[in-house]
Each structure stands twice: as structure tokens, then as C-alpha cells.
Amino acid sequence: MTADEKGLNVSSADGSTTLHLGALVQFDSREFFGDGGGVLNNSFLLRRARLISDGTIGKYTSYLFVPEFGNGSGGTATTVAILDAAVTVAPTTAVQFKFGKFKSPLGLEELQGDPNTNFVERTFVSSLLPNRDVGAVVTGSLFGGALSYTAGLLNGIADSTTASGNSDFDNDRDVDARLWAQPFVADKDSPLWGIGFGVGGSAGREKGTSAVTAGYKTDGQQTFFKYGSSVYADGEVWRITPQASYYYGPLGALAEYVVSAVNVRPSAPTATTALPKTQLENKAWEITGSYVLTGEDASYSGVAPREPFNWANGTWGALQLVGRLEDVRIDPKAFPTFAAFATNANEARAWGAGFNWYLSRAVRLSQDFLQTRFSTNGRLPTTQILLHNETALITRVQLSF
């Protein structure tokens, strides 16, 4: 048994059965400026509070179980939820089978660990993708890690949504798949070693109001677009998301694009009436860059400081600067049949800058300055949030082990 900044680890004598206990706590402060007289609430928020249990049972089986006790993105209290509950059977690195509830295998930023994202909140690209779903996938790594793949069947959920239960809302399933290539991964001394690129996609059929996204949010987690309450998904849904990243020493970069399509009707069909359905295609892109001022390597899994912060010894951990641009555009056909002009933006453009201070492998302080501009079809919105640019200063204290 060992206990350190990576958590509590227990292992059998032969090492075939292991248990790791960890946690993730993210405490945020959100301050909004220029919102026209206190429209947005400045507040403290327990964004995430999770207990993490993972390990192995025998030679080929591993598991992950994560309950969520935090407030989530909305800033209001929530019930305890099972975030991840998955079992993986891995006969080889090339062929592994995963069953349960886990992140949908689509987006590069979405698949990044929640403690390791460059900014405290993900971009619009992740808003147009599902979060966690229930299903089964086959995954693996080939050619020494130069190519990895995932493909499988999942229940299927709306954009920016986590499956809330163990059952599906209709009789159909979604097919999810992703390919990721790192062609120079074997040459660690090459400046091309950190290049990665790939594509994720999903396709299926969905029916019901629950298959329509509950809304898209800004970096400050304010809803700027939401379909009408009666809008009914009925037919094909699909997503495609090309993606790439690059890491070289202290430099890191990540870029992603997504198209998310759904067929919808203004209301649910009845035995006598079925209003025409329309395919809507919403699109988003993002570019994120980072640089570690203290010289440590940037990576997809975060920054590990050479020396932890120690006032007496004069060591300061690692300091990273980050910046990003992002944009999301709603299909013009959404207005006004499926979304009201007065209460929704048709486009949101945002930029952000910030820094991350890694006091140790387990403790991180972050501060992000983020601004979002809205386009509202050339009309004056009635929603106060859309009348002004969103300017937010978000500070986070994070403990992760």
C-alpha cells in the first residue's frame, strides 16, 4: 500500500489486482463585467467534487467508477450522479473491450481529462458533442502507438449532454468511431514527435424531445441558444469532428472543428398530424495554444512541475500561459421555427487568455479572462444575457490525485 500525491494505491502480492483511490475537487470564483447592471451573478461554485476508484482485477480486466458530488456547470445544487462506471477487458493493447458509462469517443478536447484542460471550461466544440453515454466499444493501439482507434454502439444522447440513466429513450443506437494518428511517436528526439491528428464521428437515429440539446453555453456557463420546448428530434443525427494537436517541449497547441446535425420537427407527430422535419447543422471550431514559462514539457495530460512549490526552498512549481479562439454558428434554418429570434443568438465568438500555476502534480491554480460576443440575426434580443458581451474572470483552485 502506498499513499502519495497520486492517491492511495493498494496492490496484491503478485500485482495482478490493484486499487487506486483518488479525488478531484474544483472550486471556482466567477466574476462578470459590463453585463448591464448585475444581470449575471458573481459567485463561488464547487464545479466538480468527485471520488475516483479505478484499478485492475486479474491480468486482463480493469475498471473505473466515479460519482459526482459537485454543482456541475449550471451553478445550482444537484443530486449525486454516477459519472463513469466502466469495465475494460484488454487481452492485448491492440484489442480492448469497454462496457458501461464513459466519455463518448469523439472529440479531442472532450476526451481530455477534466483536471488537464488548458482552460477551466471547454470550448464551443465540446458543446456540440455528447459528453458521457452508455454502451460498448472496442478500442486499441497499433504500431507502437502510431495509430489508435475506437468504435462501438452507444445509446445516443444530445449535444452537450451526459446520459442520466441506464435506459435509452428510443429503440435506436448510435455508432461512434474515432481514429487518431501519431506517426512520429517512436522518434522522441524529433520535433515532429508531438504531432497528432485524427477524426471522430457518430451516426444514428433519435426520436423525442430528450434527443434535442438542452442548450449551448458560453465560457461563463450562460445559455445563449436553446431550442423551443416542443421541438422534437425525429430522424438521422450525425457528427463529424476533425482534430489535431502538437506538443514540443513547453509548447502545446490543439485545434478542432465539428459539425453536429439533427433532424427535428416543431412538435411531436400525432396520429393525424406530422409537421415537416428539417435537418439542422450547427458548426464550431477552436484553436488553443499554451506555453510553459518554467520550461517543463507541455502535454495532453497536463504539466508535471520539476520541483513542487516550496517557499523555504525557493521552488515555485510550473507556470503555464494559455490562449484560445473559438466560434459556434447555429444553422440559419433553426430560426424562427425551432428557436425564437428574441431569446437566442445565432453565433457566438469568443477569445480567452489565462495562466495555470501547478504548485505540484496534485494542486493547480488557474485564472482565465474570457470574452464572448453574440450575433442575434440583426435583431434586438429580449434576453438580458445577449444584450451585452459576456466578459468573465474565472479563478479555480483544483486538487486532483
Predicted regions and their residues:
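Outer-membrane beta-barrel pore domains
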Residues: 37-38, 88, 191-193, 201, ...
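Outer membrane beta-barrel
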Residues: 3-207, 281-314, 318-336
